[in-house]
């Protein structure tokens, strides 16, 4: 060996190590000869390592690739310093390396290179270069690329019920004539080359086509777009390789399983994506090294081998990526989601990046990866990717919204895109030269990236014109693009594009021709392990379902108790049929929950499917297989509870045959609802259509209508209903038992026994063969449904696309923009012109300037289970530690810190938005203790997550906020003017009619949504404004617009504090003061910034060891770098302690002390009312909002009416004219069944469909409630009232259809009774749905509860078992069941006064209809008044429970 191996794995000369050893010996008084014995042992260790390496090289290639040598520390003898410096070489199985050992290996290698990623990568590269192995390179070209879309424009693009109807009709007409949609050009004849080993920065304003270009270059453009032109990788078109595996697209949308930890998420992506050609490259490397007699560094060798191990659940690549992206501190924290607390937004963005970096792709297209990151973190990540690009020959195109100068300088090439044109594509060094040739220059202390994004804007361009001798004129984007073609960089690019790429130079490993990273079997194993993990994390849900089934089983077994179940005559069969049907419906409804589970996981599945993580069928098959044990458990639970207690046929064989029937029924139900979820893909549509399918298979299942009574045109429905076969299997198994072999005395049925007589009367199979035929049919249905489910997963795309409304008149927009150009210039330049004064006029509504001081704030949460598992013994985790500060009127304060420092947490604590945890400390509002009720009235909070009602337009959202949050003293006209001015300030006036939509699915882009969030708070005219990441997700120009708005707000005397991640120099220096936090929620600076941040810089430069800031460097970035945890470790100081012992801290404490005393003459804030508007105005405003929202929600309301029409037509044709032909009790039973199904299934569809609608609005409600906008009861009233209006229309439509088609008697009282009961039923179903969402933590839990409730209501509706036959101990449930009252009301109003005579099966006598109903069903016509009152009662009860849940329960955890 050439040198000693230190604990870090680095080498040093024997001479230096010997000298150091001798010096220590003399210093410590040790015996130098004893030290030489230790040195001898080190020599022996080196010899052992060499022997092991020689043995390793003799192994076959496969075994050699799986073995490596690791050094492990051993006792070096003695008790001095050198005792710990000896190592033993151990041969290890790399393929089965323990995760802990893998992390230790990585830490040693990283420590050896002193955390310098580039040196670490160089060691990889040097090893390859040493034996002449060339890394693959990819050159991406795009030529004459055009992308366009067909769009509606103006208000015609809004998805109102009217427009949705017109679109449907237009779609049908367009099959014959051309559509009137307009062509929207997204990319316009763009050309360029993305070169390997060069970092390319893609810049451009929002909606310029950046994401579209990136998706097109990775072979994943939106299928609705028309793409023309040519895209090649190394001269090869997409048909010659798999672009999804060759390149990686990092989306700007963060889609992850919220229940998985960060490490698990990256481990899964690494496992699926595989190592590509790295294994073959490493095999060739080891072969060449062996032939050349080269011995590599054992630790580097082991690390490289560990990175190419495939199919394992844990991989060292994950640890490398975690460390490179700074995610190692949260590696074992769950990712989290909307309702589950997890990692921060910035960390989530890094997980999205890391997910793609774990794979083998060397062409990376990264879309806005810095959103939510601080500038220091962004710089570190981009620097790492730059090192990968330069050292490993990667090809990278990255778009960033606000790259600071130091990050911008890391890139080699710049692509500037605007309005679909490429304005510049070439070296970074030449781009300013290009714009100067056009007359525009970047000012000093202005970031170049910010300049580039503003100089193409009509409103911002003039300020950069520097040719004073020439009069300025607007230079359009198209003109810039033409000028670039004449510029020397553009001409060079054209020449390069004219020379085709030489395909023969393509590295064999550059382009991937293998579709997936793993074999099909390995993919299945990977997906199954992930799905099993998710099932365990959601174990509460499955336990709850089992408990729910247990309760339903208990109800069923006591409802049909064997002591009340005789089996001696034909009429006794009805109760057994009721028990079987109740069981069957319970099993079917139990499978309904699969619909929600399937749809919830689809977005993540689609992302991973499209990136070729795994074949779609492996995901589907994993879900199918993992639900088999669930079916076994639930079927076993049900039959054990019910079989013998109910008193079914006692033979053991029949017990197991019934179990088999339930098992395959459950499997069939799961397969059916999985299929519906995969096909329909929207929860609203799936719930509606799912209930319709359930209705069809139930309607034709042989219980509601027997086979002989089904109309000829519907008989196919009978034979294709899976439930018919389930019914047959259960009935044949029961009624062919020996105890039913009693002779049949009914001459009208030619069957020897009452068991067979019953089967024959229902049209069921009458032999034992019927059971096995039915089981076979159910298995067949299950297989067909599962195959179709796999096909749906494979071929269907996600529904919805991100889009906004295009202006109806582009020319008009341009003229308006031109007229505003001069005015905006004045605002930008901060002049005192009339426009600037006008822009602030809306901000001078009366308000009270207020200060906010806080002292010694601490915040704790319960210790997460993941951290407890790692050995943390504390019961609480401290997120904020002893934070003190003050925010004052007219002072703009920046709250800055690295990701996870606690910025949002502090803001939530101060704003009173925390719903969990323990808060300690003192908060004063202008000297008085803060009261949250009052504080909500005078403060605004712009949340980091932009939460808005998706079905409102931009204008409607802002008007609604102003309506409820401005004082009632502000008249309507003033309010309207104020709204217009706020919209103009944040430049939303051109988007006034744009639909807000759902993030990443439809509607506004990220930056448009951010501006809407700010506008919604600004129209409240608050005294104190909190803004959480107001510029996150915005480009430099939009961020400047927002900050100008904020500055204007501060200048009116308001108190404003903003958290901010990656401010540019000009944005950072627009702040007056800074509160800087470090990880752990501790303050390291609180004070003024000063001119050009001079005060801040002087403070840090005065700390010993802190490097001076270089000229032109961004102070925000410098500040974060010099105060980072790495800097603290290097300087061996704690910046929080430095601050706590500083004069600055003491002066801040003095300021807090001053602000803790009320100013002279200032009274504590109080308002005569809790809310700005009275209750009536709140109700009016909320009702207006809900009407607007419902009108623009066709997936819910249009589908509701379409399904009502379908339900009505199905019932009408199945029970055609039954109301006119009542001759026997069977006819009456058929009508009873029709009424029961008509009420129950459409009502249940309403209930289920409304769940996601109310759930989305509840998230918005939580924000509005925290803002103190209105009383929760006014919200409850508005949503209930609007839903009732739509339900009433639905009830009228439904009543007219089925009343006329079934043939009920046309009498006014009977018709209006029917109409009332239908409208009331729909009302209580929808109100119950709203109540469930308000009273449960998640939509998923609500959906699970629905199946329990519907099963219970079904059992006690009075149809499966009539009220007189219900055991006395359960009759209260019948009266508590709203569905039973509706069936009572409909049947009693239609027939309980009828004197018709009907025949009774099995008896020779006849009965009058009203007597039969009273004796057998318990229905009396005289009782109708009470039935009407009961419906009013249920509507009122469910409404008040909904109001209670909304008012008193809060399931949002913050």
Curated annotation (Swiss-Prot):
The chain crosses the membrane at residues 540-560, 577-597, 613-630, 637-656, 659-679, 684-704, 775-795, 1196-1216, 1236-1256, 1284-1304, 1314-1334, 1341-1361, 1372-1392, 1423-1443. Glycans are attached at residues 163, 393, 745, 829, 832, 951. Residues 524-735, 1178-1391 form the ABC transmembrane type-2 domain. It is an enzyme of class 7 (translocase). The keyword Mitochondrion does not apply. This is ABC transporter G family member 43. GO terms for biological process: cadmium ion transport; defense response to bacterium; import into cell; response to bacterium; response to cadmium ion. GO terms for molecular function: ABC-type cadmium transporter activity; ATP binding; ATP hydrolysis activity. Its EC number is 7.2.2.-. The keyword Cell membrane applies. It comes from Oryza sativa subsp. japonica.
């Amino acid at each position: 060996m050439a040198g000693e191996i230190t604990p870090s794995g680095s080498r040093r000369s024997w001479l230096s190590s010997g000298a150091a050893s001798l010096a220590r010996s003399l210093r410590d008084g040790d015996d130098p000869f004893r030290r030489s014995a230790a040195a001898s042992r080190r020599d022996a260790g080196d010899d052992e390592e060499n022997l092991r390496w020689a043995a390793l090289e003799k192994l076959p290639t496969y075994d050699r690739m799986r073995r490596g040598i690791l050094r492990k520390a051993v006792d070096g003898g003695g008790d001095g310093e050198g005792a710990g410096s000896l190592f033993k070489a151990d041969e290890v199985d790399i393929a089965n390396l323990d995760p802990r050992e893998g992390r230790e290996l990585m830490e040693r290698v990283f420590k050896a290179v002193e955390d310098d990623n580039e040196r670490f990568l160089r060691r990889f590269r040097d090893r390859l270069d040493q034996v002449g192995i060339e890394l693959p390179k990819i050159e991406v070209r795009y030529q004459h690329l055009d992308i366009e879309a067909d769009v509606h424009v103006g208000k015609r693009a809004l998805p109102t019920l009217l427009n949705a109807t017109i679109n449907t009709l237009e779609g049908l007409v367009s099959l014959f004539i051309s559509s009137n949609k307009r062509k929207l050009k997204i990319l316009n004849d763009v050309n360029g080359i993305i070169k390997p080993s060069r970092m390319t920065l893609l810049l451009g304003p929002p909606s310029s086509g950046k994401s579209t270009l990136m998706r097109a270059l990775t072979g994943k453009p939106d299928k609705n777009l028309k793409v023309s032109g040519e895209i090649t990788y190394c001269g090869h078109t997409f048909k010659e390789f798999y672009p999804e595996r060759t390149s990686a697209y990092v989306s700007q949308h963060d889609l992850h399983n919220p229940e998985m930890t960060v490490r698990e998420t990256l481990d899964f992506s690494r496992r699926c994506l595989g190592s590509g050609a790295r294994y073959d490259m490493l095999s060739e490397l080891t072969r060449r090294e062996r032939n050349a007699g080269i011995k590599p560094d054992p630790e580097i060798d082991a690390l490289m081998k560990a990175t190419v191990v495939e199919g394992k659940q844990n991989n060292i690549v994950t640890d490398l990526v975690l460390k490179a992206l700074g995610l190692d501190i949260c590696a074992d924290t769950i990712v989290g989601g909307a309702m589950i607390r997890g990692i921060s937004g910035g960390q989530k963005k890094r997980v999205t990046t890391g997910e793609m970096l774990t794979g083998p792709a060397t062409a990376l297209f990264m879309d806005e990866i810095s959103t939510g990151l601080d500038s220091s973190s962004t710089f570190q990540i981009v620097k790492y990717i730059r090192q990968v690009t330069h050292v490993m020959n990667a090809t990278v195109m990255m778009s960033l919204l606000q790259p600071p100068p130091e990050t911008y300088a890391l890139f080699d090439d710049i692509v500037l895109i605007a309005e679909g044109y490429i304005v510049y594509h070439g070296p970074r060094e030449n781009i300013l030269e290009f714009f100067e040739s056009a007359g525009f220059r970047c000012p000093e202390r202005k970031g170049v990236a910010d300049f580039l994004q503003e100089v193409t804007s009509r409103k911002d361009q003039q300020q950069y014109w520097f040719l004073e001798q020439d009069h300025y004129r607007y230079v359009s984007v198209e003109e810039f693009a033409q000028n670039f073609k004449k510029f020397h960089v553009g001409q060079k690019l054209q020449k390069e594009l004219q020379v085709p790429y030489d395909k023969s130079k393509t590295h064999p490993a550059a382009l991937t021709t293998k579709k997936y990273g793993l074999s099909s079997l390995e993919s299945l194993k990977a997906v199954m392990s992930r799905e099993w993990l998710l099932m365990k994390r959601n174990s509460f849900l499955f336990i709850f379902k089992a408990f729910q089934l247990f309760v339903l089983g208990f109800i069923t077994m006591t409802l049909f108790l064997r002591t009340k179940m005789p089996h001696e005559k034909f009429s006794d069969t009805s109760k057994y049929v009721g028990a079987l049907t109740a069981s069957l419906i319970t099993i079917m409804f139990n499978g309904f929950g699969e619909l929600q589970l399937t749809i919830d996981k689809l977005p993540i599945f689609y992302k991973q499917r499209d990136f070729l993580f795994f074949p779609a069928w492996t995901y589907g098959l994993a879900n199918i297989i993992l639900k088999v044990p669930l079916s076994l458990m639930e079927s076993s639970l049900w039959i054990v509870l019910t079989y013998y207690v109910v008193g079914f046929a006692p033979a053991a064989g029949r017990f197991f045959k019934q179990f088999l029937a339930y098992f395959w029924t459950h499997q069939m139900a799961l397969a059916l609802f999985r299929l519906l979820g995969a096909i329909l893909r929207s929860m609203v549509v799936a719930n509606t259509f799912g209930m319709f399918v359930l209705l069809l298979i139930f309607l034709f299942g042989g219980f509601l209508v027997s086979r002989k009574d089904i109309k000829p045109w519907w008989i196919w429905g009978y034979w294709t209903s899976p439930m018919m076969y389930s019914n047959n299997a259960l009935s044949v198994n029961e009624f062919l038992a020996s105890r039913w072999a009693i002779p049949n005395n009914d001459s009208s049925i030619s069957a020897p026994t009452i068991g067979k007589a019953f089967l024959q009367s229902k049209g069921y199979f009458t032999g034992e063969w019927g059971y096995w035929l039915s089981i076979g049919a159910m298995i067949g249905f299950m297989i067909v449904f599962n195959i179709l489910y796999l096909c749906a997963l494979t071929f269907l795309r996600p529904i919805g696309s991100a889009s906004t409304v295009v202006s109806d008149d582009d020319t008009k927009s341009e003229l308006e923009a031109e007229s505003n150009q001069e005015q905006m210039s004045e605002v930008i330049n901060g002049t005192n012109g009339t426009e600037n004064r006008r822009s602030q006029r809306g901000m001078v509504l009366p308000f009270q300037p207020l200060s906010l001081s806080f002292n010694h704030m601490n915040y704790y949460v319960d210790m997460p289970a993941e951290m407890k598992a790692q050995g943390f013994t504390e019961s609480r985790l401290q997120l904020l530690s002893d934070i003190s500060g003050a925010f004052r009127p007219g002072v703009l304060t920046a709250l800055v810190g690295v990701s996870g420092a606690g910025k949002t947490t502090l803001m939530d604590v101060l704003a009173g938005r925390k719903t969990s945890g323990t808060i300690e400390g003192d908060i004063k509002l202008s000297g008085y203790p803060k009261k949250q009720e009052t504080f909500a009235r005078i403060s605004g909070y712009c949340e980091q997550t932009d939460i808005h009602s998706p079905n409102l337009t931009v204008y409607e959202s802002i008007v609604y906020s102003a309506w409820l949050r401005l004082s009632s003293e502000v008249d309507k006209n003033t309010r309207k003017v104020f709204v217009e001015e706020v919209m103009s300030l944040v430049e939303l006036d051109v988007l006034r009619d744009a639909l807000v939509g759902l993030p990443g699915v439809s509607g506004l882009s990220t930056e448009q949504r951010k501006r809407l969030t700010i506008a919604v708070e600004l129209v409240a005219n608050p005294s104190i404004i909190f803004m959480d990441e107001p510029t996150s997700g915005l480009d430099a120009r939009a961020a400047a617009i927002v900050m100008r708005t904020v500055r204007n707000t501060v200048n009116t005397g308001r108190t404003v504090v903003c958290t901010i991640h990656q401010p540019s120099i000009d944005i950072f220096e627009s702040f007056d003061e800074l509160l800087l936090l470090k990880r752990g929620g501790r303050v390291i600076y609180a004070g003024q910034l000063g001119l050009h941040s001079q005060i801040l810089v002087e403070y840090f430069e005065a700390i010993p060891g802190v490097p001076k800031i270089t000229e032109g460097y961004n102070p925000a970035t410098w500040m974060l770098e010099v105060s980072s945890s790495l800097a603290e470790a290097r300087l061996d100081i704690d910046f929080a302690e430095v601050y706590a012992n500083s004069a600055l801290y003491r002066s801040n404490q003095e300021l807090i002390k001053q602000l803790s005393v009320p100013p002279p003459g200032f009274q504590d804030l109080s308002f005569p009312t809790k809310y700005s508007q009275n209750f009536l105005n709140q109700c009016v405003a909320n009702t207006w909002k809900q009407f607007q929202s419902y009108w623009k929600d066709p997936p819910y309301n249009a589908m509701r009416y379409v399904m009502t029409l379908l339900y009505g037509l199905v019932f009408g044709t199945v029970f055609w004219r039954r109301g006119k032909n009542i001759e026997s009790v069977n006819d009456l039973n058929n009508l009873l069944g029709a009424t029961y199904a008509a009420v129950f299934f459409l009502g249940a569809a309403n209930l289920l469909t409304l769940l996601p609608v109310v759930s989305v609005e509840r998230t918005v409600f939580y924000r509005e409630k925290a803002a103190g906008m209105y009383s929760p009861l006014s919200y409850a009233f508005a949503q209930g009232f609007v839903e009732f209006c739509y339900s009433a229309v639905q009830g009228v439509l439904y009543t007219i259809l089925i009343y006329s088609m079934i043939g009920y008697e046309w009498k006014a009282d009977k018709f209006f009774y029917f109409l009332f009961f239908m409208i009331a039923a729909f009302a209580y179903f929808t109100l119950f749905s709203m109540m469930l969402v308000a009273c449960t933590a998640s939509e998923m839990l609500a959906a699970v509860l629905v199946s329990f409730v519907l099963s219970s209501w079904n059992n006690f509706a009075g149809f499966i078992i009539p009220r007189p036959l219900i055991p006395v101990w359960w009759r209260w449930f019948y009266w508590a069941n709203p569905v039973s009252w509706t069936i009572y009301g409909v049947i009693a109003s239609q027939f309980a006064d009828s004197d018709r005579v009907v025949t009774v099966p099995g008896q020779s006598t006849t009965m009058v209809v009203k007597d039969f109903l009273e004796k057998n069903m318990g229905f009396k016509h005289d009782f109708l008044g009470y039935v009407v009152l009961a419906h009013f009662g249920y509507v009122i009860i469910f409404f008040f429970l909904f109001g209670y849940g909304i008012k008193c329960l809060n399931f949002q955890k913050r």
